[in-house]
A protein has these predicted regions:
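Hydrophobic alpha-helical scaffolding
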Residues: 34-41, 103-104, 241-245
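Conserved redox-cofactor binding core of oxidoreductases
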Residues: 1-66, 74, 267-269
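Short, hydrophobic/aromatic-rich segments at coil-to-beta transitions
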Residues: 72-78
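Residue-level marker for well-ordered alpha-helical positions
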Residues: 2, 45-46, 108, 124, ...
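Non-transmembrane alpha-helical segments in soluble domains
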Residues: 5, 48, 52, 114, ...
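Glycine-rich loop(s) and the adjacent beta-strand/alpha-helix scaffold that form part
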Residues: 37-38, 53, 62, 66-67, ...
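Surface-exposed helix-capping loop/turn segments at secondary-structure junctions
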Residues: 11, 119, 257-269
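FAD cofactor-binding and catalytic pocket of flavoenzymes
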Residues: 98, 123-259, 266
Length: 269
């Protein structure tokens, strides 16, 4: 996080602190792999236990297959039971009926369930205009030890490149410092063979920054479309237009400049 701060200040770029949604954080740096101490205040340890304490029933190890529809009314959800690992479906079916159904399956899972259910779609918009804030990463080697796998990640940010770009102009982006567990670093670096091994040998000195690109506010940023495969699982078609590519290039350039301003000896996407 300090690399972002130092680089931003040297370039005259504004930055700020992120209010982290935690309680009793041990600063282990495993955030990207799932919090091992339940300090991260996710729905798993906040909303769901609260609901259970107030009479809710949690149906787990099932996959929602389709909504039970009566015209425009949703009567429940038909589900498929999963194996103990929650990976492979079994032959068992589970039907959940309710007075109210709230669909919260994310930007890809939600339209997929609506498509499988053949829900009313008079304007043929289900699954279209899917926006995901495309993300770019720049990894840099610093002369000092960073040990990015220790401590709290994503505690600083910069919205400079959001505030200096009009909403309907070039694609703006937010810059943060992601959690960098060694496994996450190893699968995200654009290298292989000896180059990959050399990079990982320098891991204690590696800083990473990520940019969250603001899509959906320009006529050339039309987003993607969620479709169904032959087996009913979702797939995403997200065309990378020249407009999006320009945002990708600008974000990588901005992060690289901040890293070099902070003393980096090498940076790579």
């Amino acid at each position: 996080n300090n690399v972002l701060k130092v680089g931003a200040e040297k370039l005259g770029i504004s930055w700020g602190h992120i209010r982290r949604n935690i309680n009793g954080c041990w600063n282990l740096g495993y955030c990207g792999m799932g919090c091992p101490t339940n300090a991260k205040q996710s729905m798993l340890i906040t909303t769901i236990p609260f609901a259970l304490d107030h009479g809710a029933t949690l149906v787990h190890h099932v996959r929602a297959q389709q909504l039970l529809l009566d015209g425009e009314r949703v009567l429940g959800v038909e589900c498929q039971a999963m194996d103990a690992a929650g990976v492979r479906p079994t032959s068992a079916r589970v039907t959940v009926k309710a007075r109210h159904v709230v669909l919260a399956a994310g930007a890809i899972g939600s339209p997929a369930l609506l498509l499988r259910s053949k829900a009313p779609d008079p304007y043929k918009l289900v699954g279209r205009r899917t926006f995901l804030h495309p993300t770019t990463i720049s990894m840099a080697t610093m002369p000092e030890k960073i040990e990015a796998n220790n401590g709290a990640p994503q505690s600083l940010y910069s919205d400079h490149f959001l505030h200096t770009q009009p909403v309907d102009g070039a694609m703006g982006f937010k810059i943060e410092v992601p959690p960098l567990h060694p496994m996450l670093a190893s699968i995200n670096v654009m290298a292989s063979g000896e180059q990959h091994a050399q990079f990982m040998s320098q891991f204690p000195h590696v800083n990473a920054m990520l940019s969250l690109l603001r899509d959906g506010f320009h006529t050339q940023s039309t987003g993607g479309q969620v479709l169904l495969r032959s087996d009913g699982t979702p797939q995403l078609d997200y065309p990378i237009s020249d407009y999006v590519w320009q945002g990708v290039r600008q974000s990588l350039l901005a992060m690289g400049e901040m890293q070099f301003a902070a003393g980096a000896t090498m940076a790579m996407p």
